[in-house]
Amino acid sequence: MTAIDPIRLAAALLLVLLASAAARSQETETDIWRKVREGQFAGRSFEPGADQVITLEAPNRAEDAAVVPILIHAVQSQQPQRFIKKIYLVIDKNPSPMGAVFTLTPDSGRADIETRIRIEDYSWVRAIAEMQDGKLYMATRYVKASGGCSAPAGKDMESAMARLGKMKFRTDGGVQLGEPNLAELMISHPNVSGLAMDQVTRLYAPPRFVRTVQVSYAGKTVMSADVDFTISENPNFRFYFVPRADGELKAEVVDSSNATFETSVAIRSGAGAGS
């Protein structure tokens, strides 16, 4: 039997990996993405090594296209000298491909964002990190889902409107000062896309959805978001913040009808929070 040359084997494996990466890069270059990139990131390039900056978790096939869980994970913590300034969420095949733009600061501690989204058709989902120095890094996942944006909202719209704008904060365990703490913001809102037909009246319900979210701690912004109906009914966001001392965690939300909602919770070292 002829001995296998380890150098040739390594070279062959490297060529296979490079070819696979090139094929994947071409595969993700859809016409819609090219238009979004030219409109939002014209003249800017994407840096290599994105998996050392940002990752994206999403199911390969969604159980419910109107409620698809995603987790955007920042590999490194937020430091004043190097941090993720913005995260762009793009779903190529959605009616509104640029579904969300999250703005973060060093006071976020970590730039992780977890939420639930609607996906209208089989699509590439993209999480793009913009660093404080302007460099761009992109993570992608292909998700098989259909009909999420045109699916009707909850069955009882009257009850949903009665709860409109009610919000609640929750933290996991006792809050640790000077450390990134995970918090969750739950918003009661039908987030009507305007794309779902009423099967009885055959009419489309007018759109009404959350447009902006701003979360601050002790008066300093830790996370803000410009969003649309890409976010699922009853928007839910999990994010981090770093409390330097006891203070107030506050959320201000505005929807597409210019209705404004607020909630806040007192944060005390060692105690959990729930508003």
Report residues per predicted region.
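Bacterial N-terminal signal peptides that target proteins for export
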Residues: 1-11
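Short edge beta-strand/loop segments characteristic of extracellular beta-sandwich folds
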Residues: 57, 69-78, 182-190, 198-203
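Aromatic sugar-binding surface patches on proteins
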Residues: 107-114, 229-238
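Sec/Tat signal peptide C-region and signal peptidase I cleavage site
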Residues: 20-25
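Extracellular Ig-like/FN3 beta-sandwich strand-entry sites
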Residues: 120-124, 180, 244-248
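Low-complexity, Pro/Ser/Thr- and charge-rich linker/hinge segments at domain boundaries
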Residues: 27-32, 147-168, 270-275
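N-terminal edge beta-strand
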Residues: 38-65, 159-177
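Short acidic/polar inter-strand loop motif in beta-rich domains
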Residues: 131-138, 254-263
